[in-house]
Protein backbone atom coordinates (compact mmCIF):
# COMPACT_ATOMS: atom_id res chain seq x y z
CA UNK A 1 0.00 0.00 0.00
CA UNK A 2 2.92 2.30 0.79
CA UNK A 3 4.31 1.84 -2.74
CA UNK A 4 0.98 2.86 -4.30
CA UNK A 5 0.92 5.96 -2.12
CA UNK A 6 4.41 6.95 -3.27
CA UNK A 7 3.40 6.61 -6.93
CA UNK A 8 0.29 8.76 -6.41
CA UNK A 9 2.36 11.39 -4.64
CA UNK A 10 4.97 11.43 -7.40
CA UNK A 11 2.43 11.87 -10.19
CA UNK A 12 -0.18 14.19 -8.78
CA UNK A 13 0.85 16.02 -5.62
CA UNK A 14 3.30 18.34 -7.41
CA UNK A 15 0.48 19.58 -9.63
CA UNK A 16 -1.68 20.54 -6.66
CA UNK A 17 0.85 22.33 -4.50
CA UNK A 18 2.05 25.91 -4.84
CA UNK A 19 5.77 26.10 -5.49
CA UNK A 20 8.45 28.19 -7.10
CA UNK A 21 8.97 27.98 -10.86
CA UNK A 22 12.42 28.16 -12.40
CA UNK A 23 13.89 29.43 -15.66
CA UNK A 24 13.85 26.91 -18.54
CA UNK A 25 11.26 24.76 -16.79
CA UNK A 26 8.29 23.33 -18.66
CA UNK A 27 4.73 24.66 -18.85
CA UNK A 28 4.26 23.98 -15.14
CA UNK A 29 7.11 23.00 -12.84
CA UNK A 30 6.72 22.99 -9.08
CA UNK A 31 8.99 22.00 -6.22
CA UNK A 32 8.25 21.28 -2.59
CA UNK A 33 9.71 23.59 0.05
CA UNK A 34 11.21 20.76 2.07
CA UNK A 35 14.54 19.53 0.74
CA UNK A 36 17.17 16.87 1.20
CA UNK A 37 20.83 17.35 0.23
CA UNK A 38 19.89 20.79 -1.12
CA UNK A 39 17.37 19.23 -3.50
CA UNK A 40 13.55 19.36 -3.24
CA UNK A 41 11.95 16.19 -1.90
CA UNK A 42 9.20 16.40 -4.53
CA UNK A 43 9.33 17.92 -7.99
CA UNK A 44 6.67 17.78 -10.68
CA UNK A 45 6.38 19.01 -14.25
CA UNK A 46 3.68 19.25 -16.89
CA UNK A 47 4.98 19.80 -20.40
CA UNK A 48 3.94 19.96 -24.04
CA UNK A 49 6.01 19.05 -27.10
CA UNK A 50 4.02 20.64 -29.92
CA UNK A 51 4.65 19.32 -33.44
CA UNK A 52 3.20 20.48 -36.76
CA UNK A 53 3.52 17.65 -39.27
CA UNK A 54 3.18 19.04 -42.79
CA UNK A 55 3.95 17.01 -45.89
CA UNK A 56 3.62 17.24 -49.66
CA UNK A 57 3.83 13.90 -51.48
CA UNK A 58 5.45 14.51 -54.84
CA UNK A 59 4.94 10.92 -56.04
CA UNK A 60 5.22 7.31 -54.86
CA UNK A 61 1.84 6.25 -53.53
CA UNK A 62 2.23 7.27 -49.86
CA UNK A 63 -0.60 9.83 -49.94
CA UNK A 64 -2.49 8.04 -47.15
CA UNK A 65 0.52 7.68 -44.83
CA UNK A 66 1.25 10.48 -42.35
CA UNK A 67 4.84 9.23 -42.12
CA UNK A 68 7.34 8.45 -44.85
CA UNK A 69 7.25 4.67 -44.38
CA UNK A 70 9.17 3.00 -47.22
CA UNK A 71 7.68 -0.38 -46.33
CA UNK A 72 4.22 0.89 -47.27
CA UNK A 73 5.11 1.85 -50.85
CA UNK A 74 2.79 -0.14 -53.19
CA UNK A 75 5.38 -1.40 -55.68
CA UNK A 76 2.75 -2.48 -58.24
CA UNK A 77 0.69 0.68 -57.80
CA UNK A 78 0.39 3.36 -60.44
CA UNK A 79 -1.09 6.30 -58.52
CA UNK A 80 1.56 9.03 -58.53
CA UNK A 81 -0.80 11.87 -57.77
CA UNK A 82 0.44 14.59 -55.43
CA UNK A 83 -1.02 15.21 -51.99
CA UNK A 84 -0.72 17.98 -49.39
CA UNK A 85 -1.65 17.49 -45.72
CA UNK A 86 -0.98 18.95 -42.27
CA UNK A 87 -1.80 17.80 -38.74
CA UNK A 88 -0.64 18.14 -35.15
CA UNK A 89 -1.29 14.55 -34.06
CA UNK A 90 2.37 14.07 -33.08
CA UNK A 91 2.04 16.66 -30.30
CA UNK A 92 2.97 15.15 -26.94
CA UNK A 93 1.77 15.90 -23.41
CA UNK A 94 3.64 14.53 -20.43
CA UNK A 95 3.59 14.57 -16.64
CA UNK A 96 6.78 13.81 -14.74
CA UNK A 97 7.29 13.52 -11.01
CA UNK A 98 10.42 13.02 -8.90
CA UNK A 99 10.24 11.91 -5.29
CA UNK A 100 13.33 11.72 -3.06
CA UNK A 101 13.15 9.24 -0.22
CA UNK A 102 14.71 9.85 3.20
CA UNK A 103 17.68 7.66 2.30
CA UNK A 104 18.49 9.97 -0.61
CA UNK A 105 17.35 7.62 -3.37
CA UNK A 106 15.08 9.09 -6.02
CA UNK A 107 11.94 7.69 -7.65
CA UNK A 108 10.88 9.05 -11.03
CA UNK A 109 7.50 8.52 -12.69
CA UNK A 110 6.49 9.56 -16.21
CA UNK A 111 3.19 9.47 -18.09
CA UNK A 112 3.20 10.67 -21.71
CA UNK A 113 0.54 10.83 -24.42
CA UNK A 114 0.24 11.95 -28.01
CA UNK A 115 -2.66 12.17 -30.49
CA UNK A 116 -1.37 9.58 -32.94
CA UNK A 117 -3.95 6.96 -32.09
CA UNK A 118 -5.90 7.37 -35.33
CA UNK A 119 -8.01 10.38 -36.35
CA UNK A 120 -6.48 12.47 -33.59
CA UNK A 121 -7.34 10.09 -30.75
CA UNK A 122 -5.08 10.14 -27.71
CA UNK A 123 -2.49 7.36 -27.42
CA UNK A 124 -0.36 6.28 -24.47
CA UNK A 125 3.36 6.59 -25.26
CA UNK A 126 5.02 6.11 -21.89
CA UNK A 127 3.99 5.20 -18.37
CA UNK A 128 6.75 3.99 -16.07
CA UNK A 129 8.33 4.26 -12.63
CA UNK A 130 12.11 4.29 -12.28
CA UNK A 131 14.44 3.90 -9.31
CA UNK A 132 18.24 3.77 -9.14
CA UNK A 133 18.30 0.30 -10.71
CA UNK A 134 14.79 -0.58 -11.92
CA UNK A 135 12.45 0.72 -14.58
CA UNK A 136 8.96 -0.81 -14.67
CA UNK A 137 6.23 0.21 -17.09
CA UNK A 138 6.04 1.21 -20.74
CA UNK A 139 9.02 2.97 -22.27
CA UNK A 140 11.52 2.53 -25.11
CA UNK A 141 12.29 -1.14 -25.71
CA UNK A 142 15.74 -2.04 -24.39
CA UNK A 143 16.77 -3.66 -27.69
CA UNK A 144 16.99 -0.18 -29.24
CA UNK A 145 19.22 2.71 -28.25
CA UNK A 146 17.01 5.19 -26.41
CA UNK A 147 19.51 8.05 -26.79
CA UNK A 148 19.54 7.90 -30.60
CA UNK A 149 17.24 9.85 -32.87
CA UNK A 150 18.24 11.71 -36.05
CA UNK A 151 16.93 15.26 -36.00
CA UNK A 152 14.33 14.91 -38.76
CA UNK A 153 10.95 16.45 -39.57
CA UNK A 154 9.21 13.21 -40.57
CA UNK A 155 8.95 10.93 -37.57
CA UNK A 156 9.06 7.48 -39.18
CA UNK A 157 12.82 7.56 -39.32
CA UNK A 158 15.18 5.21 -41.19
CA UNK A 159 13.60 1.84 -42.11
CA UNK A 160 15.92 -0.20 -39.86
CA UNK A 161 15.50 2.05 -36.83
CA UNK A 162 14.37 0.52 -33.52
CA UNK A 163 12.00 2.92 -31.80
CA UNK A 164 9.50 0.59 -30.19
CA UNK A 165 7.83 1.26 -26.85
CA UNK A 166 6.68 -1.79 -24.90
CA UNK A 167 5.74 -2.63 -21.31
CA UNK A 168 8.81 -4.07 -19.64
CA UNK A 169 10.70 -4.81 -16.46
CA UNK A 170 14.26 -3.52 -16.77
CA UNK A 171 17.22 -3.73 -14.43
CA UNK A 172 20.28 -1.54 -15.00
CA UNK A 173 23.46 -0.52 -13.25
CA UNK A 174 27.05 0.62 -13.69
CA UNK A 175 30.44 -0.93 -13.23
CA UNK A 176 32.79 0.68 -10.72
CA UNK A 177 34.23 3.29 -13.07
CA UNK A 178 30.75 4.33 -14.30
CA UNK A 179 31.96 4.21 -17.91
CA UNK A 180 30.01 1.04 -18.61
CA UNK A 181 26.26 0.67 -18.11
CA UNK A 182 24.56 -2.73 -18.28
CA UNK A 183 20.84 -3.32 -18.88
CA UNK A 184 18.64 -6.42 -18.80
CA UNK A 185 14.92 -6.52 -19.49
CA UNK A 186 11.82 -8.64 -19.93
CA UNK A 187 9.81 -7.06 -22.75
CA UNK A 188 6.15 -7.65 -23.59
CA UNK A 189 5.96 -9.76 -26.78
CA UNK A 190 4.64 -8.16 -29.96
CA UNK A 191 1.47 -9.83 -31.26
CA UNK A 192 0.01 -7.29 -33.72
CA UNK A 193 0.07 -8.87 -37.17
CA UNK A 194 -1.37 -7.17 -40.25
CA UNK A 195 -0.92 -8.58 -43.75
CA UNK A 196 0.97 -6.33 -46.16
CA UNK A 197 -0.18 -6.04 -49.76
CA UNK A 198 2.86 -7.39 -51.57
CA UNK A 199 3.06 -10.70 -49.73
CA UNK A 200 0.55 -12.54 -47.60
CA UNK A 201 1.76 -15.78 -46.01
CA UNK A 202 -1.02 -17.94 -44.67
CA UNK A 203 0.07 -17.48 -41.07
CA UNK A 204 -2.34 -16.45 -38.32
CA UNK A 205 -1.79 -14.73 -35.01
CA UNK A 206 -1.27 -16.94 -31.96
CA UNK A 207 -1.11 -16.12 -28.26
CA UNK A 208 2.44 -15.53 -27.02
CA UNK A 209 3.57 -17.25 -23.83
CA UNK A 210 7.06 -15.81 -23.17
CA UNK A 211 8.53 -12.31 -22.91
CA UNK A 212 11.29 -11.05 -25.17
CA UNK A 213 14.65 -11.08 -23.34
CA UNK A 214 17.18 -8.30 -23.93
CA UNK A 215 20.66 -7.46 -22.69
CA UNK A 216 22.76 -4.38 -23.45
CA UNK A 217 26.15 -2.88 -22.60
CA UNK A 218 26.82 0.84 -23.09
CA UNK A 219 30.18 2.64 -23.02
CA UNK A 220 29.87 6.32 -22.07
CA UNK A 221 32.43 9.06 -22.64
CA UNK A 222 32.36 12.83 -22.90
CA UNK A 223 32.24 12.64 -26.70
CA UNK A 224 29.19 10.32 -26.74
CA UNK A 225 28.69 6.57 -26.40
CA UNK A 226 28.86 3.14 -28.00
CA UNK A 227 26.23 0.49 -27.27
CA UNK A 228 25.82 -3.22 -27.97
CA UNK A 229 22.47 -4.95 -27.43
CA UNK A 230 20.93 -8.35 -28.06
CA UNK A 231 17.50 -9.95 -27.98
CA UNK A 232 16.12 -13.48 -27.70
CA UNK A 233 12.50 -14.23 -28.59
CA UNK A 234 10.12 -17.17 -28.66
CA UNK A 235 7.55 -16.43 -31.37
CA UNK A 236 4.36 -18.44 -31.74
CA UNK A 237 2.34 -18.58 -34.96
CA UNK A 238 -0.67 -20.54 -36.11
CA UNK A 239 -0.25 -22.30 -39.46
CA UNK A 240 -3.21 -24.13 -41.00
CA UNK A 241 -4.93 -24.13 -37.62
CA UNK A 242 -1.98 -25.64 -35.74
CA UNK A 243 0.25 -23.67 -33.38
CA UNK A 244 4.00 -23.74 -33.79
CA UNK A 245 6.90 -21.63 -32.56
CA UNK A 246 10.49 -20.72 -33.32
CA UNK A 247 13.35 -18.78 -31.76
CA UNK A 248 14.24 -15.30 -32.90
CA UNK A 249 17.43 -13.45 -32.04
CA UNK A 250 19.18 -10.25 -32.99
CA UNK A 251 22.09 -7.92 -32.29
CA UNK A 252 22.66 -4.19 -32.65
CA UNK A 253 25.68 -1.91 -32.49
CA UNK A 254 24.96 1.81 -32.16
CA UNK A 255 26.54 5.04 -31.08
CA UNK A 256 26.77 8.79 -31.21
CA UNK A 257 29.70 11.19 -31.45
CA UNK A 258 29.20 14.90 -30.82
CA UNK A 259 31.37 18.00 -30.67
CA UNK A 260 31.27 21.15 -28.56
CA UNK A 261 29.41 22.92 -31.39
CA UNK A 262 26.65 20.28 -31.13
CA UNK A 263 27.57 18.72 -34.47
CA UNK A 264 26.89 15.00 -34.15
CA UNK A 265 27.22 11.70 -35.96
CA UNK A 266 24.84 8.80 -35.15
CA UNK A 267 24.68 5.24 -36.42
CA UNK A 268 23.00 1.89 -35.80
CA UNK A 269 23.57 -1.55 -37.33
CA UNK A 270 21.19 -4.47 -36.81
CA UNK A 271 20.98 -8.10 -37.84
CA UNK A 272 19.23 -11.28 -36.82
CA UNK A 273 16.36 -13.67 -37.45
CA UNK A 274 12.76 -13.30 -36.33
CA UNK A 275 13.15 -9.62 -35.33
CA UNK A 276 11.17 -7.86 -38.07
CA UNK A 277 8.65 -6.73 -35.47
CA UNK A 278 11.32 -4.32 -34.24
CA UNK A 279 12.25 -2.71 -37.58
CA UNK A 280 10.26 0.47 -38.04
CA UNK A 281 9.30 0.10 -41.73
CA UNK A 282 7.90 -3.43 -41.30
CA UNK A 283 7.04 -3.58 -37.59
CA UNK A 284 3.68 -5.15 -36.83
CA UNK A 285 3.30 -6.75 -40.26
CA UNK A 286 3.71 -10.37 -39.17
CA UNK A 287 7.01 -10.90 -40.97
CA UNK A 288 8.92 -12.51 -38.11
CA UNK A 289 8.48 -15.97 -39.65
CA UNK A 290 7.18 -17.74 -42.75
CA UNK A 291 6.00 -21.24 -43.78
CA UNK A 292 8.53 -23.25 -45.80
CA UNK A 293 8.00 -26.06 -48.32
CA UNK A 294 8.95 -28.50 -45.56
CA UNK A 295 5.81 -27.52 -43.64
CA UNK A 296 7.68 -25.73 -40.86
CA UNK A 297 7.83 -22.09 -39.80
CA UNK A 298 11.24 -20.47 -40.13
CA UNK A 299 12.49 -17.22 -38.62
CA UNK A 300 12.90 -14.44 -41.18
CA UNK A 301 16.51 -13.26 -41.64
CA UNK A 302 16.94 -9.50 -41.84
CA UNK A 303 19.60 -6.85 -41.46
CA UNK A 304 20.00 -3.12 -41.93
CA UNK A 305 21.50 0.07 -40.67
CA UNK A 306 21.43 3.83 -40.78
CA UNK A 307 23.73 6.82 -40.31
CA UNK A 308 23.03 10.51 -39.73
CA UNK A 309 25.08 13.67 -39.48
CA UNK A 310 23.94 17.01 -38.10
CA UNK A 311 25.97 20.15 -38.76
CA UNK A 312 25.45 23.54 -37.10
CA UNK A 313 26.29 26.43 -39.44
CA UNK A 314 25.42 28.85 -36.63
CA UNK A 315 23.99 28.27 -33.14
CA UNK A 316 20.49 28.63 -34.63
CA UNK A 317 20.86 27.26 -38.16
CA UNK A 318 21.63 23.58 -38.74
CA UNK A 319 21.13 20.76 -41.24
CA UNK A 320 20.84 16.96 -41.20
CA UNK A 321 21.64 14.21 -43.68
CA UNK A 322 20.35 10.65 -43.08
CA UNK A 323 20.78 7.38 -44.99
CA UNK A 324 19.38 3.95 -44.12
CA UNK A 325 18.28 0.58 -45.47
CA UNK A 326 16.59 -2.68 -44.49
CA UNK A 327 16.79 -6.07 -46.18
CA UNK A 328 14.75 -9.20 -45.40
CA UNK A 329 13.98 -12.37 -47.32
CA UNK A 330 11.87 -15.54 -47.34
CA UNK A 331 13.53 -18.59 -48.93
CA UNK A 332 11.69 -21.75 -50.04
CA UNK A 333 8.26 -20.48 -49.05
CA UNK A 334 5.37 -22.90 -49.25
CA UNK A 335 3.12 -20.25 -50.75
CA UNK A 336 2.62 -16.52 -50.86
CA UNK A 337 0.34 -14.06 -52.62
CA UNK A 338 1.30 -11.23 -54.93
CA UNK A 339 -1.54 -8.73 -54.85
CA UNK A 340 -2.34 -6.10 -57.47
CA UNK A 341 -0.66 -7.37 -60.63
CA UNK A 342 2.47 -8.88 -62.08
CA UNK A 343 4.66 -6.47 -64.05
CA UNK A 344 3.95 -8.01 -67.48
CA UNK A 345 0.74 -10.01 -67.34
CA UNK A 346 -1.88 -8.26 -65.17
CA UNK A 347 -3.42 -10.86 -62.86
CA UNK A 348 -5.02 -9.94 -59.57
CA UNK A 349 -3.98 -11.78 -56.40
CA UNK A 350 -1.54 -14.26 -57.91
CA UNK A 351 -0.84 -17.34 -55.77
CA UNK A 352 2.84 -18.29 -55.92
CA UNK A 353 3.98 -21.76 -54.80
CA UNK A 354 7.44 -23.00 -53.77
CA UNK A 355 9.14 -19.66 -54.21
CA UNK A 356 11.42 -17.03 -52.73
CA UNK A 357 10.68 -13.42 -51.85
CA UNK A 358 13.05 -10.66 -50.73
CA UNK A 359 12.74 -6.93 -50.24
CA UNK A 360 15.07 -3.96 -49.74
CA UNK A 361 13.99 -0.61 -48.35
CA UNK A 362 16.37 2.31 -49.02
CA UNK A 363 15.95 5.73 -47.44
CA UNK A 364 17.61 9.14 -47.54
CA UNK A 365 16.83 12.70 -46.55
CA UNK A 366 18.30 16.15 -46.16
CA UNK A 367 16.83 19.02 -44.17
CA UNK A 368 17.50 22.51 -42.90
CA UNK A 369 16.32 23.76 -39.51
CA UNK A 370 16.21 27.15 -37.86
CA UNK A 371 15.55 28.15 -34.25
CA UNK A 372 14.06 31.68 -34.31
CA UNK A 373 13.88 31.75 -30.52
CA UNK A 374 14.39 29.48 -27.55
CA UNK A 375 12.35 26.24 -27.58
CA UNK A 376 11.16 26.79 -31.18
CA UNK A 377 12.46 24.92 -34.25
CA UNK A 378 11.15 25.23 -37.81
CA UNK A 379 12.34 23.14 -40.73
CA UNK A 380 11.87 21.82 -44.22
CA UNK A 381 13.04 18.45 -45.50
CA UNK A 382 13.33 16.40 -48.68
CA UNK A 383 12.61 12.68 -48.16
CA UNK A 384 13.35 10.00 -50.76
CA UNK A 385 12.97 6.22 -50.60
CA UNK A 386 12.95 3.12 -52.78
CA UNK A 387 11.23 -0.20 -52.13
CA UNK A 388 12.38 -3.12 -54.29
CA UNK A 389 11.19 -6.73 -54.31
CA UNK A 390 12.50 -9.91 -55.96
CA UNK A 391 10.27 -12.96 -56.27
CA UNK A 392 10.19 -16.35 -57.96
CA UNK A 393 8.20 -19.59 -57.87
CA UNK A 394 5.33 -21.28 -59.69
CA UNK A 395 2.17 -19.33 -60.60
CA UNK A 396 -0.62 -20.53 -62.88
CA UNK A 397 1.47 -23.58 -63.82
CA UNK A 398 4.29 -21.35 -65.03
CA UNK A 399 7.67 -20.44 -63.60
CA UNK A 400 8.02 -16.78 -62.63
CA UNK A 401 11.24 -14.99 -61.73
CA UNK A 402 10.96 -11.25 -61.63
CA UNK A 403 11.58 -8.09 -59.66
CA UNK A 404 9.90 -4.75 -59.20
CA UNK A 405 10.71 -1.48 -57.47
CA UNK A 406 9.12 1.87 -56.87
CA UNK A 407 10.43 5.10 -55.42
CA UNK A 408 8.69 7.86 -53.49
CA UNK A 409 9.48 11.48 -52.72
CA UNK A 410 8.05 13.76 -50.07
CA UNK A 411 8.66 17.29 -48.83
CA UNK A 412 8.16 17.47 -45.06
CA UNK A 413 7.92 20.69 -43.09
CA UNK A 414 6.65 22.02 -39.80
CA UNK A 415 7.71 23.23 -36.40
CA UNK A 416 8.50 21.84 -32.97
CA UNK A 417 7.79 23.94 -29.88
CA UNK A 418 8.67 22.78 -26.39
CA UNK A 419 6.57 24.36 -23.67
Predicted regions and their residues:
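Outer-membrane beta-barrel biogenesis signature
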Residues: 20-49, 53-69, 275-279, 317, ...
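Extracytoplasmic loops and strand-loop junctions of Gram-negative outer membrane beta-barrel proteins
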Residues: 28-31, 73-80, 151-155, 198-200, ...
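Cleavable N-terminal export/targeting peptides
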Residues: 1-31
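Detector for outer-membrane/organellar transmembrane beta-barrel domains
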Residues: 219-358, 362
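Outer membrane beta-barrel
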Residues: 37-66, 76-192, 209, 214-225, ...
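Outer-membrane beta-barrel proteins
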Residues: 57-61, 120, 145-149, 191-196, ...
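Outer-membrane beta-barrel "beta-signal"
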Residues: 403-419
Amino acid sequence: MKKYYIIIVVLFLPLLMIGQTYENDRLLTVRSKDSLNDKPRIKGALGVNMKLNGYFDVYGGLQDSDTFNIGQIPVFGTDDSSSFKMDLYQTQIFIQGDYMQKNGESIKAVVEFDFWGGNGHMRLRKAFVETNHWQIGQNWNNFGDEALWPNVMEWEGPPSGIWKRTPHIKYFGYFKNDLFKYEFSLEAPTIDFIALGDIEPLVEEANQVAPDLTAALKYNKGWGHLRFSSILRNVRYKLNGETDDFLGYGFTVSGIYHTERKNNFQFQLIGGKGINAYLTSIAGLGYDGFPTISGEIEATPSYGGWVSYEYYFTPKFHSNVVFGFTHYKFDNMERYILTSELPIDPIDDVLVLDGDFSSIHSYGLINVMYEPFERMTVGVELDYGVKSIDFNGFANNEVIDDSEERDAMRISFGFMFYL
